[in-house]
Every structure is written in C-alpha cells, then in structure tokens.
Design a protein with these regions (language model features):
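Basic, glycine-rich
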Residues: 1-3
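Short beta-strand-to-coil "C-cap" segments at the C-terminal boundary of structured domains/repeats
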Residues: 163-166
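Acyl-donor binding region in acyl/amide transferases
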Residues: 23-26, 50, 56-57, 62-65, ...
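Short amphipathic alpha-helix that is part of the acyltransferase structural core
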Residues: 6-46
Length: 166
C-alpha cells in the first residue's frame, strides 16, 4: 500500500490544491467584481479600476482576483502610485502572493513608482511580506467618512498601509 492510499479524502483534496499549476491571466472588471462579491470576507467590489487580474488553475478555474486603481487617499494620488484595492482568493495556497507580485510587475511596466495597499490591523499580511511589501504602520480610520461610502459594511477596525517601491 502506497502512502497516497493511506490519506483521507480531505488530505487528498488539500494535496490536489497544493500541487496545481497556476498562472496569472487578465479578467474583466465585471467578472472580478462578481468574484469579490461572492468570496471576499469583509468588502464588496470596488467602483472602478485601472486593471484587474486573476490566477487560474490548470483546470481553468479562478482561484483569486486582484483589482488595482488610483489611491483612495487623495493625498497619495500623485500619478505615480497605484493602489491594490482588492485581493480575494478561494484559499488556494500562494494565490495572494502571486497576485501581489503580478500587480507590482504590471504597475512597473505602466510607469508607476510605488504600489500601496491596506489590510485590517487584525490581518498579518503574510502574502504582502512574501511579495516584499513594507508595512508603514496604521493608517486611515475605523470607518469611511464620505457620503458615497456610507452604509458599507466595513469592519470598524484600523488599517495598516503596505508599500512597495518599484
């Protein structure tokens, strides 16, 4: 009896997810928004974007998406800074790191000098660290203040700003 035959069904499913070959591919804003609305833990899709990308498995299934756009903070919107507004995955290993890395490569090709993104203070930022982002510390507030953003169900928690100079 081989070692694989002794694995439980759950362990086999985990192994299948780890061993998949994945690739980055473009995705429409509409498709990315639908994915985010379905799977994101605490945010809805964004209003607009500069570009969207996805990570596809060798079976063609979407395992994660990223939406990039202008910085939400007017103070940081200098024309050379791109913000990764949303990253969402189905939990497949390394997908978020792949998305952040691809976003940075694309941003550099487009002429951006810096990429920023935010996480909740309660999130550890492991995929950002793996993609060589640096935590600048706490930023923003616990809720949106603009009229346009009222009523969004966003956790009342401080954010951490992460930056990567290109």
């Amino acid at each position: 009896m081989s070692g694989l035959e002794q694995l439980t069904d759950q362990e086999k499913k985990i192994l299948e997810r780890v061993n998949r070959k994945m690739r980055v591919a473009p995705i429409t804003f509409r498709e990315a928004s639908a994915y985010i609305d379905h799977l994101h833990r605490h945010h809805r899709a964004t209003i607009g974007c500069k570009f969207c990308i996805s990570v596809l498995g060798d079976d063609g299934d979407i395992h994660g998406v990223a939406v990039c756009g202008r910085p939400v903070s007017r103070r940081l919107d200098d024309g050379f800074t791109l913000e990764v507004n949303r990253v969402c995955s189905d939990g497949t290993r390394n997908v978020c790191s792949m998305l952040y890395g691809a976003c940075c490569r694309i941003a550099k090709e487009m002429g951006y000098r810096k990429v920023i993104t935010y996480t909740l203070v309660s999130e550890d930022g492991a995929s950002l660290k793996a993609s060589n982002f640096i935590c600048e510390g706490e930023a923003g507030g616990t809720h949106w203040t603009g009229k346009r953003n009222r009523g969004q169900e966003i956790p009342a928690e401080m954010k951490k700003r992460w930056v990567k100079n290109l």
